[in-house]
């Protein structure tokens, strides 16, 4: 870091070529020495917790001087043997497992002497690049931050089956001499191949590299070819559900959670509360595996070491040091790291880094919190999973920060490997084709750290976890400030004030409540009022008694409503008074509604059930408020004329008077509705008028249109004798309209008996003469066709069993003879020569 002292003893070790052995790392000099400027004064020793004074650089984890190797478990003064579980007293470093004096051999669990082996990402913002055969020189970022003592060692030789050695220590051959079939991408070579560009010499370079890196460069990153070309050796953060299929039998258990919520922001700090920094470089989609690198926000090194057995079980070590940056609204960030210290219980340490003070040292959240973020694992399916730490300590796994996990499967198990992912996901992430267990959902409002795996399908969480980040409601503070005692206990205590608007009918109530009479409520419900006729014939409406309780309407109604009797008296008083001396601001006076128009309005309200028409009537009655524009429009057009226009009624006072008189004459037809009464009135007046008069012709036309439906056929059939008489006395024009009306009736079997009576048949037959118009004859023919179809369908027998067909049969025979004679007469008229010869 800037301003830190130079540690001369820190040097980076170059990577060996393929086919060579790695000799003792400390004795070799690097071609380009890497100057490390750590702030740490005390040298980390074996078995001691590192004391760090490293400044926190943005988007970087704190750095300790103790360096570890990626993908290797810590060892304590012991050689690494294949399949042996290590016991360690090593100190942990951010982003790596604790290391002791051991050197790393290719693909095996290694011992290191505080050296960073390829696969361990430096904790500073600048990652060191160890020099490789590609000519990649160790670089550091321009900021001049310190680098770790990285020694780039190849994990395995590519051109020979020899094992990379470190300090002369041997290792299990089974871990290195891997059959080439396990690695389809190694081009038939034995050993563990890193991912490099095509045609390059396959050497595993350092996994420590700086952030500014071109995509064209070879990706010598952590990851190896898995048993399947189509499977990836690590998890790619692409916003999708993570799937790692590096297990030969595709039987793996997944315990992974990430906080990314499908939001990956490469090389940038997440702005959401639960985002992770991800920069994943993937090669071509056609390749079997994709190289990956997680940058400053999240330093993740995944190491899979395949081992070939009879069942091709893989000992995979998924190593992850990640950092979740949680930003609250105060721009505070919590950094969690996975440092496991020897001989201690599990505890959680979080680095709080404030935006204003980036140099805050690492602080402990809990010194010896045994219950904080502890995960205990028991053997499942003849295998044990190391969770949350890099060593075994009396089968108790310590997790510090919850960011480290190891996936291990014993050689003889049939379950494959239980994969522990190094990132957290709120949704299920799968390693392999089959997930043994499902990730437990956790609350969105509280981040619980330290448990990625489950013991017997039960999540082991601390009862009192150390709160890292909790979502707080933005509006909760304002709501909590309200005093509960001041809140109303009942609705009676609630007072709502409404501001009067221009149009209360749009859903706003008036400024003052009012009570509306019962008769007005009947209008609202579109029910006809009970009209009581006086001896003089005038209608009297039942009025609301003062002592009777009336329903209360608290919305949309104006308090100036008056009863019908009050309105009538008011309008009569206005008519009797002089117009010059009369001054009133009521709605009836404003709309200029007279007494006669008001009575017509009452009749229309009784007859019409249209709610829109009722709204207009309510405005005129004073029951509903309206804007000034609406009132002016109703006044200029007239309320009755407006309603009649909307109903397509004739906009004339004569028609309104006719309807009013018809209603007053309703007692002769007490069981008929308004339209039926009107039809009966029209039939009587039509037959009463003089023959061929204009009034009679108008009535017949109206009845012709009313008979388009069968609703009123029975009523009109009662006047059949009168209409048949018109066929003998009226002119051709009147006959045409009468026959049109009877043609409509002929389609109804219910009136066929009256229509085709003996008298009717004789009249119809009498129309077949040379003097009758062709149109009238054609209508009569259609009528006989209709009755013939009714008889053939059997509908006539269902309606009337007593209906006799004898008159119809005789009429049909006579009709045929008349038709032939008529046709001959027509032919003679069209051909004069034939007529003269005959």
From Swiss-Prot:
Residues 255-271 have a biased composition (Basic residues). Pfam families: Arm_2. SUPFAM superfamilies: ARM repeat. Residues 13-31 have a biased composition (Basic and acidic residues). Residues 1-121, 218-293, 531-552 are annotated as: Disordered. Residues 220-235, 542-552 have a biased composition (Polar residues). This is G-protein coupled receptor-associated sorting protein 2.
